[in-house]
């Protein structure tokens, strides 16, 4: 399987590293407008190939992406300290107006995985610019937020986070929604998991999830490692046809009477991209929060100068 990464910044290279050590692809092309930096990053990466299963990795132009099964887009303006993901939108839309049509010339049959922020808006923009079926364009969405949620809950409950079922849906950003009503371990609801469990912890955990990116950016300038691992998981689901349930961002199709936007819901991800959406039964409060998140995204989309 062949993949391409567009953008050799911290996120793009974290994705490349994660996929290399997990033997996700047979071939990986990485492209960036800064050729010297790109070549340095690729040199550093390929020198580690003797330690893992062989993968062909090389620095290429957009034309070299031809034949890719999946194209991972991480290119775009960097989020500044204190800047929301939605503040980025107008700068990144201008980049995508030329990037997506150029990619479509070379790999129209690829699955497009958007990671650039604000990821929900940029996924929608990519879908409209590419003119592809909805399932063929998806975003990393709240895969990372869901992982953060599970990690923090698992820390409090003393369990392996992989054994905990919990989801963050909606926008990958300030209006994201924690689906508390569905948090469980082996079918046991969160309220029954521990006699010491304090409901006051709930808001504290969610605030940590929602503010995690801001805290990391304030301390080190960018997030990279965890999103790299999350993207590798999505790509594995795509190229290995795992039909894995992941909270990726994709076009709404009438779920919960939401407006037309791209946002995250639990979705089955396989070789064809997003194969279907799993509509959870939400509480009235969760449904209202999800609608608020969708309308915030719709307002941003409506402000775009196409």
Curated annotation (Swiss-Prot):
- Alphabetical keyword list: Allosteric enzyme, Cytoplasm, NAD, Oxidoreductase, Phosphoprotein
Matching entries from Pfam families are given as: Ldh_1_C (PF02866), Ldh_1_N (PF00056)
Pathways per UniProt: Fermentation; pyruvate fermentation to lactate; (S)-lactate from pyruvate: step 1/1
Coiled coil in keyword set: no
Q: List positions binding NAD(+).
A: 11, 32, 37, 76-77, 98, 115-117, 140
- Show the GO cellular component annotation of the record: cytoplasm
What's the Enzyme Commission number for this chain?
A: 1.1.1.27
Alphabetical GO biological process terms: glycolytic process; lactate metabolic process
Q: Where in the cell is it found?
A: Cytoplasm
NAD listed as a keyword: yes
Activity regulation note: Allosterically activated by fructose 1,6-bisphosphate (FBP).
**Self-association or partners: how does it assemble?**
Homotetramer.
User: What this chain does, per the record?
Assistant: Catalyzes the conversion of lactate to pyruvate.
Return the similarity comment. Belongs to the LDH/MDH superfamily. LDH family.
The name under which this protein is listed is L-lactate dehydrogenase
